[in-house]
Amino acid sequence: MSYHFNKIEEKWQKYWADNQTFKASNDSEKPKYYVLDMFPYPSGAGLHVGHPLGYIASDIYARFKRHKGFNVLHPQGYDSFGLPAEQYAIQTGQHPAVTTENNIARYREQLDKIGFSFDWSREVRTSEPDYYKWTQWIFIQLFESWYDQEAEKSRAITELEEIFTSEGNSRINAASDDDVEKFSADDWNACSEDEKEQILLKYRLTYLAEAEVNWCPQLGTVLANDEIVNGVSERGGYPVVRKKMTQWSMRISAFSERLLQDLNKIDWTESLKESQRNWIGKSVGAHVDFKIENSKFKIGVFTTRPDTIFGVSFMTLAPEHELVEKITTEDRKEEVQAYIEASAKRSERERMADVKTISGAFTGAYAEHPFTKKPVPIWIGDYVLAGYGTGAVMAVPCGDQRDHDFARHFDLLIPNIFENVDVSQEAYAGKEGTVIANSDFLSGLEYKEALNKVILELEKTGQGYGKTNYRLRDAVFSRQRYWGEPFPVYYVNGLPKMIDEKYLPLKLPEVEKYLPTETGEPPLGNATDWAWDSKNNKVVSNKVLKQSRKLSGQHDEPNSNVTPSAVEGSDDNGIYPLELNTMPGWAGSSWYLFRYMGAGNPDRFVSEEAQKYWENVDLYIGGSEHATGHLLYSRFWTKFLYDRGWLTVEEPFKKLINQGMILGTSAFVYRLEGENVFVSKNQINGNNVQPIHADVSLVNSSDELDIEGFKKWRPEFADAKFLTEDGKYIVGREVEKMSKSKYNVVNPDEICQDYGADTLRMYEMFLGPLEQAKPWNTAGITGVHNFLKKLWKLYYDGEEFFVSDEKASADSLKTFHKTIKKVTEDIEEFSFNTSVSTFMICVNELTAQKCNSREILEPLAVLIAPYAPHIAEELWEKLGNSESVTTAKYPEFEEKYLVESMKNYPVSFNGKMRFTMELSLDMSKEEIEKTVMADERTQKQLDGRTPKKVIVVPGKIVNIVG
C-alpha cells in the first residue's frame, strides 16, 4: 500500500483537534515541563519555511517529554498588537482588528498543517481586551510601586508615603529621578496633595519624564532603537530624528544589578548573556562635579578613570544635554544650534558606531578644574550620548582615543600624564603597571593607588564620590500609535491618575482615522468618546472637557515639550481627559508566559495554584535579536511581580535556545542607472547598474528570468527593455535572510502539499544544527521524503500491512537499540539534525535485515513520533493500538543488545593473516587455542609441523609461530 501522506496528515490533525490530545492539566501527579516558543506577530504575509524552524524543534522536545512521562505545557498565541497592522489600516482604512483576525486565521491554518502539539485551549492574543486588561493591571502595579535599593526589591508606594510622613526622604535609599531634593517629614506633611504626587512621580517604577526619543514624523510615533536601521525606520524607511518628549517610562535601571547577577542562574547561551551584560553595562569609577565659570550651574560626569583627572583639557557634552542652551555664549549660539539640529538626525546607534567622523561645536563656556582650578573649555560632540552616564565627559585626550582624535581635529591641548609613554600620535589606555605623572598629589602612583586616592580626595573636598554606573537606561514606554494597549490613565490638573482596577480593561476606542490628529496628537486624539467619568467610572464623550487635550509628546514640531499640566478636566462633573498614547509592542510580550498557565482566568493574571505548579518556562526557543529587548523586559517584569508577591519565581525562562535562520536564495536583476533597461548578469561589463530583487517564482532552476512574467509583476517594469544572453536573461543569485521584502520566501503550504508535513519537519531539522544559519535548498527534500516511504514499507508485505510476532533477530535488536541510544542523546542535546541521519541508517539496516518484528517496529513508531507524528500515529493505529501514540512510553535503551557475544578472530601464521574464525567472547585462552588448532585450515597451514608457540590475545587475534 502506498504512503498517502495527505490523507494521513489530514486525518490525524483532525483527531488531535477533536480529542484535544495536547491539552495540559494544571492538576497532575506527573512532573511538569513547560515548553514555549516566542509567539509570532501575525503579519499579512503568513508563514514562510524559515518561521517553523524553532517551532519544530520545540515540538519535537515537547513530544519527547510527553513520552518520557511529563505533563507538558506547550501553548501558542499571537503578539497581535503592533505597527504593521496600523500601517495597513492607514493605507486601506480597514480596522487593525479585522486584518489581525484575518492574519491569525491564516497563521492558525498554516500551523495546524505542520502538526504542532500546541495546547490551543490556552491561546492568547495580546490585542484582546481580556488579555490587555492584565497588561494594564501590571502597569498600575508598577505605578503603585517604588524600588528600595537597600533591600534590593520593589515595594508598595504606600510604604514610601509612610516613610515620608514619619521621617522624610533623607534616610531612604530609593531609585529615583536625579533631581530629587532632600526633605523632612515636616516638609512632606506641609505639601498639598498635588505637590506630594509630583514628588512621588520621581520614585514610581513607571513615571512621566522628559526623554530623548527616536521620533519618526511620517509614522507619527516614537520608535525603539531596534526599529531603526541606518537612521531610518525599519518599516517604511522613513527619516528618524532625536527629539525631547514627555513620555511614560519604566524604571528598569533600578534592577540593573539583579538583571546582571541573575544571568548566572539561568541556562542561556554565553553569547546571549554577554549581549545583556554589555547592554546593562556595569562600570565602576567616580562621579566628579565641574563648576561652570560665571554660572550657578555645574556639570556632573561619570568616569571609570578618575586617576586621569589631571589630563583633562576640555569637556564634551551630548548635543541634547540640558545645560547646552543655558551655558552657550551669545556668539556661539548659531553654530551650536546648527550642530544640535544635525545631530538630531542621527540615531544613537549610528553615533556609537561611527568612530571615523569627528564633529563638534564650542559653547564658548568654561568649567573649572576641581583641583587645578584652571579653565576647561566646554564643547558639544555627538560621540557623547545624553542617556549614558550624565551625558557629559571629562575629556582626557592622552588616555582616550576618541578624545585624542577630537583634540587633534580641533587643535586642543593633549597634556601627557603617563610616565614614559608617548601620546603624541595616539592615546594610551593601559591600566595595570601604569604610573601617573604630571598630576600633583597623584604623581608617581600606579593606577589602582591613584584611583583610590583621587576618589578619597574628591569625597573629602565635596567635589565627587565613588560610584557604580550602568549603561542600562529607563525604558520609554509611550507610543504615538493606535493599535496598542491604552494606558489606564486620566489626568487631573495635569497629574496622572489610575483608573480603578475594578473597571479594567479600558478598551481601545473607535476612531475614523489612524493617523495623528491635525494638531499633532496621537491617533487616539481622533476618538470622540475618550474622556473618563471618575464618578461613574466609565468612558464618556470628549465634548464635556473644557479644553482640547494637549498631552505631552503629541505634537509634530521638534522639541515639543508640552507637559501634562496643560490638560484640564472639569472639576465640577469629575470628567477628565484620558491618556492618548498607547503602550509599546513589548508590553504584552513581557508577561505572556504566565497567562498561558491559567489562560482565561477573569480574577488574576495567573492563579497562584497554576503559577506554583508551572513555575516558569523550562525551555524557551526564539531569535537572538530579542536579547536586549523582549528578553530583558520580561526578566524585569518577572522580578517586579516576584518582589510584590504575585509570582514565586524571579526569572521567566530557565533555558533559552536561539535557533538560526533559514536563509533564502534571492534573485537579482540589474537595471542601468537612470534607465528602465535591465542587463543580464554576464553582460554588466562595468556598467553602472542597480541590483533589484526579483520574485524567485519568476526564475527557473537555470537562473533564467521569465521576462513577460516580470513585466506583469510590477507596473513600473511593464515597458522595460532587456539586454539578454542568447535570448535569455540570467539573474544574479545571493543567499540572504528569507523575507517577503526580498521576494525569496518559500511557502510551507506548498511543501506540505507536495511532500507532507512530516517531510517538512524532518527536512528542516536535517538542514543543519539548530543554532546555525542555513540556506534553504529543496534539492535534498526528496531524500527525506523517500526515507519516510521506506519507513512505511517496513510495515508492509507488498500491499498488505504485516508485522510479525516472532522474536527479532540479534542484528535488528542491535540496530534498534543503537538508534534509541543515539536519538535520545541527540534530542537531549538538541542535536536534531544528527537524529534524522540516525533514523535513515536505522531504516536502511532494518530493511536489509528484512525486519518485520513487532518487537522492533512498534517501539520504532514511538521513537520517530516526535519528528514525524502523523506517520507514527497511522502506523501505531495499524499495529492495533486504540490510543494516540502520544500516550506511549518512550522506548528504553538496553545495553545488552549492543554487547557483542562473538568475535571474528584473525588467525595468523608467523604474523601473516590466513583466515578468520568466529568464536565466542566467553571462551578462555585455552579454549580458543584448542578450537583454532583443531580447525582443518590450521592443520593445512602447519602441514604436519608442530608450532613453537600459539599467541592468543582474547577479543583480538590468534598468532601461530613456527
UniProtKB/Swiss-Prot annotation:
PROSITE patterns: AA_TRNA_LIGASE_I
Gene Ontology terms: cellular component: cytosol
Binding locations of ATP: K740
One Pfam family here: Anticodon_1
Catalysed reaction equations from the record: tRNA(Leu) + L-leucine + ATP = L-leucyl-tRNA(Leu) + AMP + diphosphate
Enzyme type, top EC level: ligase
Residue span of region Disordered: 548-570
Disulphide bond pairs: none
Localization per record: Cytoplasm
Coiled coil segments of this chain: none
'KMSKS' region (motif): residue ranges: 737-741
EC numbers for this chain: 6.1.1.4
Keyword field: Aminoacyl-tRNA synthetase, ATP-binding, Cytoplasm, Ligase, Nucleotide-binding, Protein biosynthesis
GO term, biological process aspect, one: leucyl-tRNA aminoacylation
GO molecular function per UniProt: aminoacyl-tRNA deacylase activity; ATP binding; leucine-tRNA ligase activity
Motif 'HIGH' region: where in chain: 40-51
HAMAP family assigned: Leu_tRNA_synth_B
Family per similarity comment: Belongs to the class-I aminoacyl-tRNA synthetase family.
Protein name: Leucine--tRNA ligase
Organism: Christiangramia forsetii (strain DSM 17595 / CGMCC 1.15422 / KT0803) (Gramella forsetii)
